[in-house]
Amino acid sequence: MAVQKSKVTRSRRGQRRSHDALTGPTLSVDKTTGELHRRHHVSADGFYRGRQVITPKGE
C-alpha cells in the first residue's frame, strides 16, 4: 500500500488541482455558411477555411 510521507495541505492540494478544470470547445463562425464549428476542424458540410476539402457522405 502506498503511504504518503507527510500530510498534503489544503493549499498544496488545491494548487495541484488548479489545472484540472474542464474548458468548453472553442467555436468559430464558418465563412461560407455562417454555421458554428470547432476551430481547426472541418465543418459538417466539408468546408475548412472557406474552401471545400471533402465531400460529405450524404452527397
Swiss-Prot record:
Question: What cellular component terms from Gene Ontology apply here?
Answer: large ribosomal subunit
Give the highest taxon in the source lineage: Bacteria
Q: Does the keyword Ribonucleoprotein apply?
A: yes
Biased composition annotated in UniProt, kind: Basic residues: 7-16
Q: Which Pfam families match?
A: Ribosomal_L32p
GO molecular function annotations of the record:
structural constituent of ribosome
Disordered: annotated span: 1-34
Q: What is this protein called in UniProt? A: Large ribosomal subunit protein bL32
